[in-house]
């Protein structure tokens, strides 16, 4: 079973859409194996998004991700990484497919509700960034 990391970003939390987003995620067949609410410091957000450090949006991304609480989730499903990317939609909600999480709930490319790992390799790294092995509950169903 494959795992991926999702982060319900500060705009999702501020707009009180945590439940709606998790409902969409679970309805798509994902199992939540770890979840917590946290607030990233600028340093922690910068470390998590270090891969984007040279990109022009890096500073804004770090500011945004440290602007309020967020909810990291470790999700499990066959083909989890690719399926979750499909479920959340394009980074820019204006370009996202109908019915995707970003199309339904996001306001802009910068505040787009949710993060999803972009590869199986990055999913492993990202899950480890937020969760210990002990925090991940094996799916017993």
Swiss-Prot record:
GO terms for molecular function: ATP binding; metal ion binding; nucleoside diphosphate kinase activity. Its main location: cytoplasm. The active site is at residue 115. ATP binds at residues 9, 57, 85, 91, 102, 112. One of its GO terms (biological process) is UTP biosynthetic process. InterPro entries: NDK-like_dom, NDK-like_dom_sf, Nucleoside_diP_kinase, Nucleoside_diP_kinase_AS. Homotetramer. Belongs to the NDK family. This is Nucleoside diphosphate kinase. The lineage of its organism: Bacteria, Pseudomonadati, Chlorobiota, Chlorobiia, Chlorobiales. The gene is ndk.
């Amino acid at each position: 079973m494959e795992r991926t990391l999702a982060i319900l970003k500060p705009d999702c939390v501020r707009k009180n859409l945590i439940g709606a987003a998790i409902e969409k995620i679970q309805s798509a067949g994902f199992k939540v194996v770890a979840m917590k609410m946290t607030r990233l410091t600028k340093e922690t957000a910068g470390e998590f998004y270090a891969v984007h450090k040279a990109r022009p949006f890096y500073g804004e991304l770090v500011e945004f991700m440290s602007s309020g609480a967020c909810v990291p989730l470790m999700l499990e499903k066959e083909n989890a990484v690719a399926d979750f990317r499909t479920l959340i939609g394009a980074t820019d909600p204006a370009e996202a497919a109908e019915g995707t999480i970003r199309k339904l709930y996001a306001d802009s490319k910068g505040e787009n509700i949710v993060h999803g790992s972009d590869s199986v390799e990055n999913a492993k790294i990202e899950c480890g960034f937020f969760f210990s092995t002990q925090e991940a509950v094996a799916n017993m169903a």
